[in-house]
């Protein structure tokens, strides 16, 4: 099985911010094959034999295989899966990407307006939007250049506070886009920030949340990878930091945190999408984020950390590294996860599954949630996989942004109200 990284190597052999031609996915299909006891090994063999990329790899029976099939392999692939059930996620992946990347031109007038959320946007427009949004609420927020990526891009953050003033309350930290291709997380974390700012003193629940917590929103944790998905390869996942093997740049930043770093939930292969890095915490962006989280924790601690991902419609708790270990706060984590999922579903009927990371999605080593809980002693550490469950996957149409934001806000508000109640 190739990683999505290998497609980028066909497009460009680069490890810097050089501009290259985008990889062309025209004619590629994304096909879901549900696995069962009698076919999971065969599906794994097909993926290996045809050297196919996957969005979801079936490690065991009952898991879906979401498979990227190039035009040259369509006939062979369809022959091999004959008799198995399948679902077409993208008939033409190139066309889906083209539709998704029709960015609307940014205007500063979008800052207080929901129109910003009708389209995806370029990295630089996100920076402009965050600065303009903060400029409308100067007494209750600040725009922060939280540090620089490996290629020198700003890692942006919005800091939001209420009646007590900044740095006066326990912190809530939201992370988005640690995996570059998960564009919906950029927009949803910005939707949360926009709502918390614009609805303060208008919505009683939001006002209470902002008054009770110092809120930090990091919409683009991995700016180099994010920019690369917009210029070169839409399906890039990792950062853009060089490795000893120059053909395979990048670390999976969510396998690079220095806690339970080695294990089956990450890879030592630089060409893997889950490459953990050469050393724990050696990712440029991870160093920046650890420093920021430690600084934030030094004020009044961190009440909650949420790392937003896509896709799968899941809301999950520790641990990623172990499928048997549970933190002492497991019951509280599960309770809040259920509250989040129930409130979210009430908005548009979107179902979310909940549970510990390892048991709910797969085993993960060196991830942000386990690190935040065990090393930084964050009280509550959680992660989400946003829309959808695979109908469109990573290439989620722009008309899904606003409903995703609406339901995620509802879940988040309900969960934080429960935290305030104790």
From Swiss-Prot:
Propeptide residue interval(s): 18-112
The top EC class, named as a word, is hydrolase
Q: Which SUPFAM superfamilies match?
A: Protease propeptides/inhibitors, Zn-dependent exopeptidases
Compartments where found? Secreted
* InterPro entries associated with the record: M14A-like_propep (IPR036990), M14A_act_pep (IPR003146), Peptidase_M14 (IPR000834)
Give the Enzyme Commission number.
3.4.17.-
Q: What are the record keywords, sorted?
A: Carboxypeptidase, Disulfide bond, Hydrolase, Metal-binding, Metalloprotease, Protease, Secreted, Signal, Virulence, Zinc, Zymogen
Q: Which residues bind Zn(2+)?
A: 179, 182, 309
A matching Pfam family: Peptidase_M14
Signal peptide annotation: 1-17
Ranges where the Peptidase M14 domain occurs:
119-419
User: Can you name a GO cellular component term?
Assistant: extracellular region
Residues annotated as catalytic: 385
Q: Tell me the cofactor note.
A: Binds 1 zinc ion per subunit.
Q: Which cysteines are joined by disulfide bonds?
A: 248-271
- Which superkingdom is the protein from? Eukaryota
Q: Does the keyword Methyltransferase apply?
A: no
Q: Which family does it belong to?
A: Belongs to the peptidase M14 family.
Q: What does this protein do?
A: Extracellular metalloprotease that contributes to pathogenicity.
In Swiss-Prot or TrEMBL terms, this protein is called Metallocarboxypeptidase A
The primary gene name is MCPA
């Amino acid at each position: 099985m190739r990683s999505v990284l290998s497609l980028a190597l066909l497009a460009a052999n680069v490890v810097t911010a050089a501009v290259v031609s985008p990889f062309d996915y025209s004619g590629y299909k994304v096909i879901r094959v549900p696995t069962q006891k009698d076919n999971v090994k065969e599906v794994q063999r097909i993926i290996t034999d045809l050297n196919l990329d996957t969005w979801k790899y079936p490690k065991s029976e009952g898991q879906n295989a979401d498979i990227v099939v190039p035009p040259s392999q369509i006939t062979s692939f369809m022959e091999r899966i004959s008799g198995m059930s399948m679902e077409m996620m993208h008939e033409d992946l190139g066309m889906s990407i083209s539709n998704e990347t029709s960015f609307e031109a940014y205007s500063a007038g979008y800052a207080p307006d929901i129109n910003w959320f009708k389209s995806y946007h370029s990295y630089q427009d996100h920076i402009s939007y965050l600065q303009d949004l903060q400029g409308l609420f100067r007494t209750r927020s600040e725009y922060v250049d939280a540090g620089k990526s490996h290629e020198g891009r700003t890692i942006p953050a919005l800091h939001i506070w209420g009646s007590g003033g900044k740095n006066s309350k326990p912190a809530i930290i939201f992370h988005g886009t640690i995996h570059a291709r998960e564009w919906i997380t950029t927009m949803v974390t910005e939707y949360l920030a926009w709502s918390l700012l614009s609805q303060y003193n208008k919505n009683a629940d939001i006002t209470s949340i902002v008054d009770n917590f110092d809120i930090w929103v990091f919409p683009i944790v991995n700016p180099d990878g994010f920019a690369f998905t917009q210029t070169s390869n839409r399906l890039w996942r990792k950062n853009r930091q060089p490795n000893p093997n120059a053909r395979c740049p990048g670390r999976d930043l969510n396998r690079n945190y220095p806690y339970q770093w080695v294990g089956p939930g990450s890879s030592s292969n630089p060409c893997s999408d889950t490459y953990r890095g050469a050393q724990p915490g050696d990712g440029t962006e991870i160093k920046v984020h650890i420093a920021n989280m430690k600084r934030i924790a030094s004020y009044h601690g961190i009440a909650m950390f949420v790392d937003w991902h896509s896709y799968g419609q899941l809301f999950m708790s520790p641990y990623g590294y172990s499928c048997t270990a549970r933190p002492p706060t497991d019951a509280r984590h599960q309770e809040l996860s259920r509250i989040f999922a129930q409130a979210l579903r009430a908005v548009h009927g979107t179902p979310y599954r909940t549970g510990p990371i390892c048991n709910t999605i797969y085993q993960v080593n060196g991830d942000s949630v386990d690190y935040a809980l065990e090393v930084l002693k964050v009280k509550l550490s959680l992660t989400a996989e946003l829309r959808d469950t695979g109908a469109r996957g990573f290439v989620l149409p722009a008309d899904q942004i606003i409903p995703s934001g609406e339901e995620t806000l509802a879940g988040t508000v309900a969960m934080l109200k429960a935290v305030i109640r104790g």
